[in-house]
Structure formats: C-alpha cells, structure tokens
A protein has these predicted regions:
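Conserved catalytic motifs of ABC-family nucleotide-binding domains
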Residues: 182
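Conserved ABC ATPase "signature" region
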Residues: 139-157, 204-208
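Conserved ABC ATPase signature
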Residues: 161-165, 169
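Catalytic Walker B motif of ABC-type/P-loop ATPase nucleotide-binding domains
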Residues: 186-190
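The feature captures the beta-strand-to-loop junction immediately N-terminal to the Walker
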Residues: 63-65
Length: 267
C-alpha cells in the first residue's frame, strides 16, 4: 500500500499508511477507545470531552503545545490518574475504573518517559525478571527471554549492566520488558526524549516493529517532527480539547493546526 509523502516535512506516514488510516472506522467497537474523558484539578478543567480510537497495528499520535492537556489525557488512559467523567474501553471491556496493573494484565502496555529498568541488573536479567512473572517453566522462560533479546536486537548486550547502556539501548530494553507482558496496545510517553539522533532512528524502527506485530501504539512526545514521521493518525490538543484529528499529512496541511501548534515553518 503506497504511503503519501509529507512534502512539507519530507517525511512519510507510518507503516499502515494514510490509506489504511482512512478505512479505520471512528465508531469501531474494537481497539483502544477513549470516549469524552474529562479531568479537572480544583476549579481548572485541563481536559474537556476528549475522544480517540486506536486500532491494533496503528500508530497514533497525541500531540499539542505545552499546557494543552495531552499529558493528563495520556495518564488517564494509562490509569495513572482517574478520569472525572467519560469512559475508556479496551476492545469490549470498560477499563475506566481499573487500576494500572489490571489494565496491563488486559493488554495495555506502558513505557514511561523516565528510565524503568533495574540498574543493578544486566540486560538479560532485566528482561527475564518480567518474563518470570508470566511463566513458571525454566525452558519457556529461557526461550521467551532469548526471543525478546533477539527481536529487539539487544542479544549482544545480554550481559551488559543496565548502567552501561546508551539512551537508545535502554529504550530497547524497556520495550522488550514491556513486550514480555504480551500487550495488544503500547502507550509510549516521550519515546524520543533524551536520546541522540541516531538512537531516534533506531526507536522509529522499533515502533514500526511493534506496529508490524499488530500492536496498536499511542505516542505522546514533544518531538513533533519525529512523531509525525512515524504515525498513521494524530489528535492535536489545545486548551484541553481536541482541535484536530486526521493523518499526519492532513495535520501539516491544516492552517488551523499550523496557527495553533506547528507554526508557519510547516507551511
């Protein structure tokens, strides 16, 4: 399926391409669905009636300027903070009131911006420690650990201490740990933060790998260019509400989005 060039940025849409994004029904009953969620802190409403829908195999971006409410919205989806109103669904299951660990058991993986690996362990031990939570057989644990190390291309680092990893290598280990939980969706909080340009390209490959495995990916990041490069669709938030939803190409071409968020350098 052909991908549409994002001529203004010299980038391309994500692995599904905009044609695939066009056929994703907004009212689909499957996938990760967020319906009219809202959140206030005291008298200040920071998220107002936000809705979005992410399908398996799709890479979806949640973007916006500082103070737009995207981080609060993202945290409500992960279960880090509760929503005041609205609902969050994982396929046909209402997970709105479930704590974060139960959402994870149901297939909602989360990669925090902050480092989440065990610094006192090797790469292999970091991955194995999560695999052991799901399996009891030593053979299965060993095979699953090896599979994740190989698929995330960190097998050569298996004996390296976590403290010796670069930013990109650490991200790969963290994603391998998250994949050990067999998620159907992955929420990536600032995946491009704190890593160099070469590592950014590396993480983009990992995100494409996740999508290719049929895992839905929801990204929030301040690195606009890199995020638009990888996503299939995007919601742009301003002042606590969704200003725009569409493909990356459509976002770049939108005068409304440029005026509120991207700026004229994207025009």
């Amino acid at each position: 399926m052909a991908r549409k060039e994002l001529s203004a940025l010299n980038i391309q849409t994500g692995p599904l391409g905009s044609d695939a994004a066009d056929i994703i029904a907004p009212a689909a009953k499957h996938g990760l669905r967020v319906q009219n969620i809202a959140r206030s802190f005291g008298d200040r409403q920071v998220v107002r009636d936000v809705s979005l829908n992410v399908q398996r195999g799709e890479v979806f971006g949640l973007l916006g300027p500082n103070g737009a409410g995207k981080t609060t919205c993202f945290y409500m989806i992960t279960g880090l903070i509760p929503a005041d109103s609205g609902s969050i669904w994982l396929d046909n299951e209402d997970i709105t009131q479930l704590p974060m660990y139960q959402r994870a058991r149901m297939g909602l993986g989360y990669l925090a911006q902050e480092a989440s690996i065990f610094r006192g362990m090797s790469v292999e031990q970091n991955v194995r420690s999560v695999v052991e939570l799901r399996h009891k057989s030593e053979t299965t644990i060993r095979e699953e650990t090896n599979r994740l190390l190989e698929e995330l291309r960190i097998d050569h680092l298996r004996n390296a201490p976590a403290t010796a990893l670069s930013g990109g290598e650490r991200r790969r280990v963290e994603i391998a740990r998250a994949l050990a939980g067999k998620p159907s969706f992955m929420l990536l909080d600032e995946p491009f933060a704190g890593i160099d340009p070469l590592a950014i390209a590396d993480i983009r490959q990992v995100i494409r790998y996740l999508s290719g495995q049929g895992i839905g990916v929801l990204i929030t990041d301040h690195n606009v260019r890199e995020t638009l490069d990888i996503i299939d669709r995007v919601s742009i938030m301003t002042s606590g509400a969704v200003l725009f939803e569409g493909t990356a190409q459509e976002a770049v071409e939108s005068a409304e989005v440029r005026n509120a968020y991207l700026g004229e350098m994207y025009g």
